[in-house]
């Protein structure tokens, strides 16, 4: 891994942590239940992660790895699949960050729809990712963390479902 790539990754991770941290501090409320606090933190972290995961796929080596994953998995409409994956991750993350940032300013039905849409997008993207991970034709070298078992993918999927559960339980 080159120095410029490492700097790019660290700057993206640091920026997302900073943005998430600032908005979590701003939305802190002493009267929130433990479930609500966990849900707010999870919303921010998932949102930041999804934006970052979609964004890094515009830069090498991630763009090359992502293109190889799609080509080797023989997903239909490879160009559309690539753009849908990248922009879907970014949009799902932005929806989650919007819910976290606009918690008090947004009307409840808008927040509810944003949470539902982000969970639906994340679920669809992660199911496709699990499929790609499990294909024998896709080597570990082109997968995130170069790991063949879809552990990270399933963790993100589980956290997205937990986040939605906590959000709608607190409503």
Regions found by a protein language model. Give the residues of each.
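Membrane-interface extramembranous regions
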Residues: 2-171
């Amino acid at each position: 891994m080159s120095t410029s790539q490492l700097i790019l990754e660290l700057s993206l991770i640091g920026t997302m942590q900073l943005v998430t941290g600032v908005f979590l501090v701003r939305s802190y409320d002493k009267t929130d239940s433990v479930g609500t606090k966990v849900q707010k933190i999870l919303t921010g972290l998932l949102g930041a992660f999804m934006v970052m995961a979609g964004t890094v796929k515009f830069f090498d080596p991630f763009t090359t790895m992502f293109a190889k994953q799609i080509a080797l998995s023989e997903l239909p409409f490879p160009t559309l699949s690539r753009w849908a994956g990248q922009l879907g991750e970014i949009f799902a993350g932005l929806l989650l960050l919007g819910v976290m940032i606009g918690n008090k300013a947004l009307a409840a039905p808008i927040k509810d729809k944003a949470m539902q849409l982000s969970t639906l997008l994340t679920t669809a993207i992660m199911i496709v990712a699990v499929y790609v991970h499990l294909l024998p034709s896709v080597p570990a070298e082109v997968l995130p963390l170069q790991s063949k078992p879809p552990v990270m993918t399933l963790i993100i999927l589980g956290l997205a479902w937990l986040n939605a559960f906590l959000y709608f339980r607190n409503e």
